[in-house]
Amino acid sequence: IYEASFIFDDIFVRVDLMNKTEKGWDIYEVKSSTRIRSYHEYDASIQWHVLKELNMFKINDIFIVTLNNKFSKKEIIDPIKFFNIDSVLDVVQSNHQEVKQKIIELKSIAASSEEPPIDIGPHCKKPHGCVYLDKCWPNNMNDINSVFRFYRMNLKKKISLYNQGIDTFEKVNDIDSLTSTQKNQMEAFRKAAPIIKKQEIKKFTDKIIYPISFFDFETFTDAVPLYD
């Protein structure tokens, strides 16, 4: 059974795949990832909680299905080799009490008329982006001189600067802590002009041997390989 839906105590879940065996039903949570992450286990745990509380049928096992990144396609895809299928039964059973407690906490927050006091941080974007970023995060974060625009700066460091009242390039005093690229950003903003290092560009292009070809790994995002 694909996409079977269940609800218990206002908690709705949709199971990716259910398979009936002689020992009971096996539950499969399918992910387009190449490894199991902790929030995948909690996805499976909430499904386990709802199904156990409903007690409609016997559950034999629960699995998380991920992609095998060592798989190499040769004509027909072998699904057994293409997927990694791992039991997380012990994990979801261990998480059960925590999940029940978390549901109580979240229902309490949902019923309250007051917003929960939560600071902004990496948790706002991972594992999934929050829909209230425009409400909690600074209005100037997308401005060209916002510290949130620093190239390749860890999000925790950006937030640390912001919490210190340093929200724009002009307020950054510790220049030495920045990378050369980030310093260039500040200089380009200050001069209102791009920084073009022609000699550095020439050194790079002089090393290129023609004809040249490119293969962009990010062009294809399909989980199932298209080509052998």
Describe each region flagged by the PLM.
Residues V131, K135-R152:
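Extended, structured, electrostatic nucleic-acid-contact surfaces
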Residues R35-I36, F71-S72, T168, F220-V224:
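Flexible loop/turn segments at secondary-structure boundaries
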Residues R35-S38, E53-L133, W137-P138:
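Metal-dependent nuclease catalytic regions and adjoining charged, substrate-binding loops involved
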Residues P138-N140, I159-L161, E170-K171, D222-P225:
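Short helix/loop capping segments that flank catalytic or ligand/cofactor-binding pockets
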